[in-house]
A protein has these predicted regions:
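C-terminal helical cap/extension that packs against the catalytic core
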Residues: 53-54, 62, 97-157
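Nucleotide phosphate-binding/pyrophosphate-handling subdomain across enzymes
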Residues: 1-106
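Short, active-site-adjacent cap segments at secondary-structure transitions
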Residues: 166-168
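Short, flexible loop segments at boundaries between secondary-structure elements
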Residues: 113-116, 179-188
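Active-site catalytic pocket residues across diverse enzymes, especially alpha/beta-hydrolases
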Residues: 20-21, 72, 127, 152, ...
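Active-site-proximal loop/hinge segments that shape catalytic or ion-binding/gating pockets
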Residues: 163
């Protein structure tokens, strides 16, 4: 389980097992340990590539963004993050931006594939008004992923987040881009 917040999820699993055991269920401790060590949650602090590091995380509300930022600070201390961000218009965009701003080197804006998606140009304008961060609106998820990767240095951290709707397309575009550019170099 990657991401600092996953420790809380593991604690819930362990407590659930404890309660089940009190009710007479027998849970093998080795199986529990194996399960916790092998659990994988796609789209949650999922690392797609190294050098540059490319992460995808489906955080789509202020609490999710707080948890994501805690993990980013833990795994990448003293580093600025290049965010690729697409958020639904029904979300608390201002709070999410305020949380992201201190850690952001740049924000690339995309539109999640949803009727509720916030227009990328409108969101870029909002970011420019509310944050002192370099911002670019991209016409598509593919263009955003390509640009972030092409303009990244090896030591950069790119984090695509803001909507669960975007995860699969971001993953597909990133994997294709890394494969085309370097034959899968440092790909996870």
């Amino acid at each position: 389980m990657t991401g600092v917040y996953q420790m809380n999820n593991a604690a819930v699993v362990i407590e659930t097992v404890r309660v089940l055991e009190q009710k007479g269920y027998r849970i093998d401790e080795t199986a529990l340990r194996k399960g916790l060590s092998e659990v994988y949650w796609p789209g949650r602090f999922e690392r797609l590539h190294e050098q540059p590091t490319f992460l995808v995380d489906g955080s789509h509300n202020p609490d999710g963004i707080r948890a994501l930022l805690e993990s980013l600070r833990s795994y990448f201390p003293d580093r600025k993050i290049r965010f690729l961000l697409g958020i639904l218009s029904t979300k608390d965009v201002s709070t999410m931006l305020r949380l992201i701003e201190p850690l952001a080197e740049e924000i690339g804006v995309i539109m999640p594939p949803s009727e509720k998606a916030m227009d990328n140009e409108r969101m870029a304008q909002q970011i420019s008004r509310e944050c002192a961060v370099r911002t670019t609106a991209f016409a598509s998820i593919e263009e955003g992923v390509r640009s972030m990767i092409e303009n990244a240095e090896k030591e950069d951290v790119i984090c695509a987040t803001g909507s669960l709707y975007s995860i699969e397309e971001i993953r597909t575009c990133a994997n294709r881009e890394f494969h085309q550019n370097c034959g899968g170099c440092e790909r996870l």
